[in-house]
Amino acid sequence: MALGARGWRRRSLLLLLLWVTGQAAPVLGLAVSSELQIQQSFVPDECPRTVHSGDFVRYHYVGTFLDGQKFDSSYDRDSTFNVFVGKGQLIAGMDQALVGMCVNERRLVTIPPNLAYGSEGVSGVIPPNSVLHFDVLLVDIWNSEDQVHIQTYFKPPSCPRTIQVSDFVRYHYNGTFLDGTLFDSSHNRMKTYDTYVGIGWLIPGMDKGLLGMCVGEKRIITVPPFLAYGEEGDGKDIPGQASLVFDVALLDLHNPKDTISIENKVVPENCERRSQSGDFLRYHYNGTLLDGTLFDSSYSRNHTFDTYIGQGYVIPGMDEGLLGVCIGERRRIVVPPHLGYGEKGRGSIPGSAVLVFDIHVIDFHNPSDSISITSHYKPPDCSVLSKKGDYLKYHYNASLLDGTLLDSTWNLGKTYNIVLGSGQVVLGMDMGLREMCVGEKRTVIIPPHLGYGEAGVDGEVPGSAVLVFDIELLELVSGLPEGYMFIWNGEVSPNLFEEIDRDGNGEVLLEEFSEYIHAQVATGKGKLAPGFNAEMIVKNMFTNQDRNGDGKVTAEEFKLKDQEAKHDEL
């Protein structure tokens, strides 16, 4: 079609624009520049690397003639074009046009025939002397000299251990191509990737890229394809010759040869006893994973964890880690998974997880323990010692082994009063009050099987708790011989019945009996068992004599204690 003057001027303007700005202009059928023309239609903000001669690239393109007719497109094949740059594998114009490109950069490239297919063209595809226009998007770039590239963007302040060959690790990752396209993510599966390092379970680049990492560290590992899935890709999501970028966060690390480790021990100055196999422990703990994630806490339940140690009641690592502790000790026990919950995990604990227990030992005892008595003060005259049947008045402070105060008579402002051996206190306390003199001060430690047992006292004494009583004996009233609730302090009148039966009617009623016994006690001629209700004792004595239960005692029914079978009362 012939062009008039106006049309010629328009074409000249467009060609000038193409030369000066690199903007592709529509061709109106006349000759164009013989120079390669490049327009950068998009350049990413970050460009850590550009294409150099000798690099291998993966890119998408759309190839058109200058009239807009498409002759080829990588998008139609759903595959990038993969090739070395500067090695004669491309037309000269494309070899030049790709140099200096960044990943994700987009270029519009116009290639004259002399830098394309020349006067011969490509039969059936590209006519001779064709100017070619390519819309190019660079997806990937690497060089055969590349190694694994590591960029650490977070490292915890404390890094006591790093990944070594043969370690087992648990980590999260996002896997992308160089252009940012996500191909896989452990986060999407909500499950860590768990594997050995350095023994061929991973692609070579990841085997190298993970070495030296700390738990809690985050790094970006860029892997060239020859250290990843190579020319063939993985057959699913990863194409051949693809560089891979892994954004990795290391959560866990151990070696199958690991044993438990004990850290951050805080041992009280006074440690008279250390735990042994067979002991029963009460302790608080926080249980976390290596990355600090809390999975359990006894504090949240407001109740200690109570267990035997060394007998398989807890995981092997804790069985071992709790040996040799002192009461009041704090320690951190790090348990590898083969001494914890293994490959399967348990509840909120993932498989193959290293566990960290921060424990505080509250108390422990052994089922074979008896009470422990430590006397702190004895008065100069300490000859009268407490025994079964004695009536005692004493003060005490009751606490747990960790010092937690449970009860105090001093706070209440009154003594605690009991008859020793009558079952009015726990067995360990009964034992701890024996052979004590007035004014003496002692500490009695009572194991739970001699205290309040596994159940404890709801809201007051924890189950299986060892108890500590600081005691001061203030008063001791000697009791009666075992089996007696009343005794005479002198000779008994041979006319006892007649003395009780003051009205001489041959019958003694309860009122008469009670009045007589109390009179004997008041004058010191008789003594009731101390610490018991006097009226109840007298009533029981009367009932024992009232053999036919008619509410009165006759001379025939009346007998003294030494005239009865054992344990009968007056």
UniProtKB/Swiss-Prot annotation:
Pfam families: EF-hand_5, FKBP_C. Residues 1-24 form the signal peptide. Residues 54-142, 166-254, 278-365, 389-477 form the PPIase FKBP-type domain. The keyword Plastid does not apply. Coiled coil: none annotated. One of its GO terms (biological process) is protein folding. A motif (Prevents secretion from ER) lies at residues 567-570. Keywords: Calcium, Endoplasmic reticulum, Glycoprotein, Isomerase, Metal-binding, Phosphoprotein, Repeat, Rotamase, Signal. It is an enzyme of class 5 (isomerase). Its EC number is 5.2.1.8. SMART domains: EFh (SM00054). Inhibited by FK506. One of its GO terms (molecular function) is peptidyl-prolyl cis-trans isomerase activity. Glycans are attached at residues 174, 286, 302, 397. Ca(2+) 1 binds at residues 501, 503, 505, 507, 512. InterPro entries: EF-hand-dom_pair, EF_Hand_1_Ca_BS, EF_hand_dom, FKBP-like_isomerase, PPIase_dom_sf, PPIase_FKBP_dom. SUPFAM superfamilies: EF-hand, FKBP-like. Phosphorylated. It is found in: Endoplasmic reticulum lumen. PPIases accelerate the folding of proteins during protein synthesis. This is Peptidyl-prolyl cis-trans isomerase FKBP9. It comes from Mus musculus. The gene is Fkbp9.
